């Protein structure tokens, strides 16, 4: 079993959802970003999504766009992001880590090289937001052949006819974007989330993670009662943007992660 399968199976036994945290590699700088990454499991993150900075993150809202700019201004590259995972893995072998981003940097790096190095440094899966299933052979199939999970995004506008196509070849978990729009947008109603989870469960046995718009422990707990995973990104990244310095940013992100984890763990 993959690290993702193992983690979700273990949490199912515990009858609770996973807290899935998203941060951007290299934000606010390499050292602070690595410190955040290393601190997330102890703060309560069950799965980590690590953003690969890109100059044109079109699916992301202002918070993550600014995080991309901060990281790129600090010299973050895809090679440095893979190195960051290697350093994280030197002390943490159980928490699943998924790289999330866009196809362009991977394409420029070289797909075969990227997959080989991602596997070697301890990446567990990929979320590539601008690569539809019609392009599975570009990355999804070779990644899975190498033992990396490929996690698909579904949205409120993904209809029942389209869902089987989107889910075909998905592995790890399904990431349901509960609001059609950019990351960090307003949250969906819980009724909408409940209906969406029920609809997805008719099409897949994979765990379902819900993201976009979750900002507080209370909201995380409410979503954790309905889904297998609660994904939080913009709220954590806002803490970095608002911190007076990088040391404070590390503390504030890990503190919020702890609050969210408590909400998720006490939800059911």
From Swiss-Prot:
The keyword ATP-binding does not apply. Pathway: Amino-acid biosynthesis; L-tryptophan biosynthesis; L-tryptophan from chorismate: step 5/5. The keyword Nucleus does not apply. Its EC number is 4.2.1.20. InterPro entries: Aldolase_TIM (IPR013785), RibuloseP-bd_barrel (IPR011060), Trp_synthase_alpha_AS (IPR018204), Trp_synthase_suA (IPR002028). It catalyses: (1S,2R)-1-C-(indol-3-yl)glycerol 3-phosphate + L-serine = D-glyceraldehyde 3-phosphate + L-tryptophan + H2O. The active site is at residues 49, 60. Keywords: Amino-acid biosynthesis, Aromatic amino acid biosynthesis, Lyase, Tryptophan biosynthesis. One of its GO terms (molecular function) is tryptophan synthase activity. One of its GO terms (cellular component) is cytosol. SUPFAM superfamilies: Ribulose-phoshate binding barrel. Belongs to the TrpA family. Tetramer of two alpha and two beta chains. The alpha subunit is responsible for the aldol cleavage of indoleglycerol phosphate to indole and glyceraldehyde 3-phosphate. This is Tryptophan synthase alpha chain. It comes from Pseudomonas aeruginosa (strain LESB58). The lineage of its organism: Bacteria, Pseudomonadati, Pseudomonadota, Gammaproteobacteria, Pseudomonadales.
